[in-house]
């Protein structure tokens, strides 16, 4: 009985993946693709775009920041969704 209980606990921990964190792209503009694991509790990714004297700028990362008018922001909640 104890063995069955222990097996159920192990299976539950493995299935729930208690240490799960969201993974988002974090490269800027035309840099090579890179990803990062977000801090615990951070469940969204963002893609922020704007234009300046250098041209079109893209910023990616974890979270969903507040932006100023004129900046396009797309937030999403799945793995690597902010490319």
Curated annotation (Swiss-Prot):
Gene Ontology CC annotation, any one? extracellular region
Gene Ontology MF term list: acetylcholine receptor inhibitor activity; ion channel regulator activity; toxin activity
InterPro entries, sorted: Snake_3FTx, Snake_toxin-like_sf, Snake_toxin_con_site, Toxin_cobra-type
Q: In which tissues is it expressed?
A: Expressed by the venom gland.
Disulfide bond sites = 24-45, 38-62, 64-75, 76-81
Q: Which UniProt keywords apply?
A: Acetylcholine receptor inhibiting toxin, Disulfide bond, Ion channel impairing toxin, Neurotoxin, Postsynaptic neurotoxin, Secreted, Signal, Toxin
Instruction: Report the locations given in the UniProt record.
Output: Secreted
Transmembrane region(s): none
- Is the Secreted keyword given for this protein? yes
Instruction: Tell me the first and last residues of the signal peptide.
Output: 1-21
Q: What is its main location?
A: secreted
Task: Describe the family membership recorded for this protein in Swiss-Prot or TrEMBL.
Answer: Belongs to the three-finger toxin family. Short-chain subfamily. Type I alpha-neurotoxin sub-subfamily.
Role played:
Binds to muscle nicotinic acetylcholine receptor (nAChR) and inhibit acetylcholine from binding to the receptor, thereby impairing neuromuscular transmission.
Official protein name in the record: Short neurotoxin II
Q: Which species does this protein come from?
A: Laticauda colubrina
